[in-house]
């Protein structure tokens, strides 16, 4: 399954969602297309496996960034988020813009991957606003929608500073963000994914 997911990711990044077909994937790994169905029930299952893989990798990167961030929580989180989106733009688009059946995701995966936004802000609505800033800025950057000459690095930093200030203003007697949190994926998502 690891080889299939790796090849699928390469196809996705090379040709976008439209370029990801079972036939192309089979050709890429050197098997006949019907043999893929022993591992995945079809393209929707393949896309779901890619979304799960992407959420797991993003979650690990974000949890690590928050654990190492100290008082620069939002900045480190946004740096990690931007790095993941920039390194894997088509996977990022599939995760955030593609439609997939949420009910079929590994239980708890999406919430765990998004938890670092809450760990940084300490408040659910502020966490959602931080994610909205991160996602909106990432998509605008990927689509090259900022005005020519815009200092996008400065835009990311300004967002981080604003959210750090808002988090400090709203944080009462709560402990530091990330206190007691692990950085690895939950045990239920660490193993090899089985057939779908």
Language model segments and positions:
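Amphipathic alpha-helical packing segments from all-alpha helical-bundle domains
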Residues: 96-131, 150-164
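Append "Primarily bacterial transcriptional regulators
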Residues: 23-27, 36
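Amphipathic C-terminal alpha-helical segment
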Residues: 132-149, 163-173
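Hydrophobic alpha-helical connector segments
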Residues: 49, 63-90, 110-115, 130
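Amphipathic alpha-helical segments used for helix-helix packing
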Residues: 82-108, 139-146
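Actinobacteria-biased recognition of intrinsically disordered, low-complexity terminal regions
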Residues: 168-196
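An amphipathic alpha-helix adjacent to DNA-recognition modules
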Residues: 1-9, 13, 18-19, 30, ...
């Amino acid at each position: 399954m690891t080889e299939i997911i790796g090849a699928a990711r390469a196809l996705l990044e090379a040709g976008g969602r439209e370029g990801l077909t079972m036939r192309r994937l089979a050709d890429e790994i050197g098997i006949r297309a019907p043999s893929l169905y022993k591992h995945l029930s079809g393209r929707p299952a393949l896309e779901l496996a890619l979304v799960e893989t992407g959420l797991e990798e993003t979650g690990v990167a974000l949890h690590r960034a928050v654990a190492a961030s100290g008082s620069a929580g939002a900045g480190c989180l946004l740096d990690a988020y931007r790095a993941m989106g920039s390194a894997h733009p088509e996977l990022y688009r599939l995760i955030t813009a593609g439609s997939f059946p949420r009910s079929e995701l590994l239980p708890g995966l999406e919430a765990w991957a998004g938890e670092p936004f809450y760990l940084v802000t300490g408040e659910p609505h502020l966490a959602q606003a931080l994610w909205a800033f991160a996602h909106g800025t990432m998509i605008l950057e990927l689509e090259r929608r900022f005005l020519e000459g815009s200092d996008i690095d400065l835009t990311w930093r300004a967002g981080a500073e604003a959210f750090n200030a808002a988090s400090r203003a709203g944080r009462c007697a709560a402990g530091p963000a990330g206190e007691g949190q692990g950085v690895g994926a939950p045990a239920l998502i660490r193993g090899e994914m089985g057939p779908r």
